[in-house]
């Protein structure tokens, strides 16, 4: 898909082109001295994680990747990760610097270890950027005992300086673009506006991930892994053609490889499918790293820096996923987790009693417990809770159910695992649920709970913890073509 660079004010320019500023196929952010309405190349945002920028070998790989496609114009980088087994991530070393300072111990030698890592890269690649000035500035601030967020963020900051010089791109600090309010709450709209305004000045740029700033200028970080969020923010703000997330795996797998040997790769997954898989325990991108791209309808491509020819996994809208998956496996993936408790409440004429479920939720709220599912019948409702959230308070919760709900009986089923079979294609095939239940029965797995939404995006079954691996293998064998 081609895009147009819109020059000047996006509202007025879009009107002249008979476009809308909300239309994601159009980039409303560039200001170049080119002919008005000039059609140009699409824009991709590429984020490279810690393993992809860990050493000189990896940096040369990412340079080849970036230079192989001129559409890769905005690059977001993490701090360097581990180079080998037993090595330290730069971010971990920086947090250790903060701990050392808090214990009133000298931090200079430990911080020098961090600097030496960047200096070695600088020297071996023959770079020209003045890293010593950056080190000195950070050292000066360290003497004022800055926040842990500031110290941890310097890993991405220093790495982006190096990589910008290595690529010949501009360095653009995320500090001025990623916005938080005075209470540390992220400001999406302000961030999008700041990114568009700043990147309008840069044709090619490297941006450090992981952090932004508070209104007073102090550094504020996202949670660990926040560089994924920064990449999605840049892609969403400019309406990129694609957000490429480069890491050390070739996308997502249809099942946990620790359970299923050599599971197939997921080539296409919708945002909704990914959320279902993530919620049920699959190791995928955090929702916060998906949302900024999803609302702008920007596809996300998970790629492997070490195998750049592999197309990886595409995360797209539901409509696009259905188009791309024609002829693929019925299911997209299988995920699950163990250690849940099911509390089944029985009460005659429950369906006629107003506010029953509301009172259940009120009790859970009193104990700060989020329910996983609430499958129900005419006179029954089952509350599925994680043992971690129950935290040894099951007897107290049951007592509250009895006194405030007055059920006829309560059944408790402990040590339950939940398994979600996810896929938009399931709704288009008759007998999907029957096939799943048959596969589990033939494997000798007793189903203790079933929950299927009306959208038929997923089927969740509850099995005993001991049958968890066996159940996932059985479902995979039934649905995935060899």
Go through each PLM region and give its residues:
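Acidic, Ala/Val/Gly-enriched low-complexity intrinsically disordered segments
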Residues: 9, 14-16, 21-23
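Structural motif
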Residues: 43-44, 72-75, 149, 169-170, ...
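Internal nucleotide-binding/catalytic subdomain
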Residues: 242-244, 265, 299-302, 307, ...
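A conserved regulatory-domain signal marking ACT and ACT-like small-molecule sensing domains
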Residues: 311-482
């Amino acid at each position: 898909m081609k895009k147009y660079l819109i020059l000047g004010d996006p509202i007025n320019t879009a009107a002249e082109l008979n476009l809308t500023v909300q239309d994601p196929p159009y980039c409303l952010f560039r200001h170049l001295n080119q002919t008005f309405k000039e059609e140009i190349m699409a824009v991709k945002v590429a984020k490279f994680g810690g393993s992809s920028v860990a050493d000189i070998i990896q940096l040369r790989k990412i340079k080849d990747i970036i230079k192989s496609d001129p559409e890769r114009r905005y690059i977001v980088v993490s701090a360097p990760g581990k180079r080998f087994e037993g090595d330290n991530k730069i971010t971990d070393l920086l947090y250790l610097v903060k701990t050392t300072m808090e214990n009133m111990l000298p931090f200079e030698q430990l911080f020098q270890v961090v600097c030496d890592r960047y200096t070695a890269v600088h020297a071996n690649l023959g770079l020209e950027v003045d890293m010593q000035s950056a080190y000195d500035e950070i050292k000066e601030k360290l003497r004022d005992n800055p926040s842990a967020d500031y110290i941890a963020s310097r890993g991405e900051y220093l790495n982006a300086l190096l990589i910008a010089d290595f690529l010949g791109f501009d360095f653009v600090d995320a500090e001025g673009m990623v916005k938080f309010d005075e209470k540390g709450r992220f400001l999406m709209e302000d961030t999008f506006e700041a990114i568009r305004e700043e990147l309008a000045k840069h044709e090619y740029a490297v941006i450090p991930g992981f952090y932004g700033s508070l209104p007073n200028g102090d550094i504020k970080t996202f949670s660990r892994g926040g560089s994924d969020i920064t990449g999605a923010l840049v892609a969403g703000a400019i309406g990129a053609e694609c957000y490429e997330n480069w890491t050390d795996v070739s996308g997502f797998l249809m099942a946990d490889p620790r359970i299923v040997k050599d599971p197939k790769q997921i080539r296409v997954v919708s945002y909704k499918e990914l959320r279902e898989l993530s919620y049920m325990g699959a190791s995928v991108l955090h929702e916060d790293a998906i949302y900024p791209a999803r609302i702008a309808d920007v596809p996300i491509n998970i790629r492997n820096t070490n195998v750049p020819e592999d197309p990886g996994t595409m995360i797209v809208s539901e409509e696009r996923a259905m188009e791309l998956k024609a002829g693929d496996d019925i299911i997209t993936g299988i995920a699950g987790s163990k250690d849940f408790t099911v509390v089944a409440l029985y009460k005659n004429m429950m369906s006629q009693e107003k506010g029953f479920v509301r009172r259940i939720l009120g009790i859970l709220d009193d104990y700060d417990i989020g329910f996983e599912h609430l499958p129900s019948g005419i006179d029954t409702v089952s509350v599925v809770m994680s043992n971690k959230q129950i935290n040894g308070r099951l007897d107290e919760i049951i007592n509250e159910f009895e006194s405030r709900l007055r059920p006829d009986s309560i059944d408790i089923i402990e040590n339950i695992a939940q398994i979600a079979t996810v896929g938009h294609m399931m709704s288009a095939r008759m007998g999907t649920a029957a096939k799943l239940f048959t596969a589990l029965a033939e494997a000798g797995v007793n189903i203790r709970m079933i929950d299927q939404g009306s959208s038929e995006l997923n089927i969740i079954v509850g099995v005993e913890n001991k049958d968890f691996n066996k159940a996932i293998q059985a479902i995979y064998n039934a649905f995935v073509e060899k």
